[in-house]
A protein has these predicted regions:
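C-terminal boundary and immediately downstream tail of ABC-type ATPase nucleotide-binding domains
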Residues: 224-252
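ABC family nucleotide-binding domain
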Residues: 3-6, 12-223
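ABC-family P-loop ATPase nucleotide-binding domain
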Residues: 1-12, 246-252
């Protein structure tokens, strides 16, 4: 039986009069990759922010590896277990690539500088950036910055990594290098929940695709089902429009 790393039950979140999440329930097994798709403003990123305790849900429950974390007092402890790759990279501009990757190891995990350096170099090598360890964010391309962000998340050795539209801030020619790293991670068995409009990645890499609209999950299932035989008409309409707009991406 697969080990359940993430479970969400009846998650609700409102911002003023706008109910962004309307009873979201989903689960993610160890080693699975699920991709959340849907129109802008439908609550996709809010789910990730609730999981990582950046935004408290109004109601509902979240479990990480069997432990309920919804009202967890020690947020820092939870965030050690959950990697987060941001849309806008989220790097510290005054730190080198190496410094950005090791900072959490030293400050949060209280690792020695020597051990943190070793692990940070290993993760930079994993994403193909060991030669840029001493470069600052201003000296890196968008794709390189995002790969540093992925290396930083990996260095914490999390149980789960959340990706919030990791390619949306990139020039088209740089998207492929980030998706290649993510594809490799999926093949290595990393547990990932990804918000993305990259249909090629979703189709070829994800175990399941979750289509959201108006704060609800409209349909969830294997890529083949959603692309070739959607059970809900709206799913087919959205995927047709999205594929027409963006194409099937780098990894189709």
């Amino acid at each position: 039986m697969s080990k359940k790393i993430l479970k969400i039950k009846d998650l609700y979140k409102r911002f003023g009069d706008n109910e962004v999440l309307r009873g979201i329930s989903l689960a993610l097994n160890e080693g699975e990759t699920k991709v959340i798709i849907g129109p802008s403003g439908t609550g996709k990123s809010t789910i990730l922010n609730c999981i990582n305790m950046l935004i408290p849900p109004d109601s509902g429950q979240i479990w990480l590896d069997g432990e309920e974390i919804t009202d967890h007092v020690n947020v820092k402890e939870i965030r050690q277990e959950i990697g987060y790759v941001f849309q806008d990279f989220g790097l510290f501009n005054h730190l080198t690539a190496l410094g950005n990757v090791r900072i959490g190891l030293i400050r949060v995990k209280k690792m020695s500088k020597e051990k943190a350096n070793q692990l940070a170099y290993e993760e930079l090598e994993r994403v193909g950036l060991v030669d840029f360890a001493d470069s600052y964010p201003a000296q890196l391309s968008g794709g390189q910055k995002q790969r540093v962000g992925i290396a930083r998340a990996l260095a914490m050795q999390p149980k789960l990594i959340l990706f919030d539209e990791p390619t949306s801030a990139l020039d088209p020619e740089l998207i492929g290098e980030v998706l290649t790293v993510m594809k490799d991670l999926a093949q290595e068995g990393m547990t990932m929940l990804v918000v993305s409009h990259e249909m090629g990645f979703a189709k070829s890499v994800s175990d399941e695709i979750i289509f959201m609209e108006h704060g609800n999950i409209v349909e969830e299932g294997p890529p083949q089902q959603l692309f070739e035989n959607p059970q809900v008409e709206r799913t087919g309409e959205f995927l047709f429009k999205l594929t027409e707009l963006y194409g099937e991406g780098e990894n189709s």
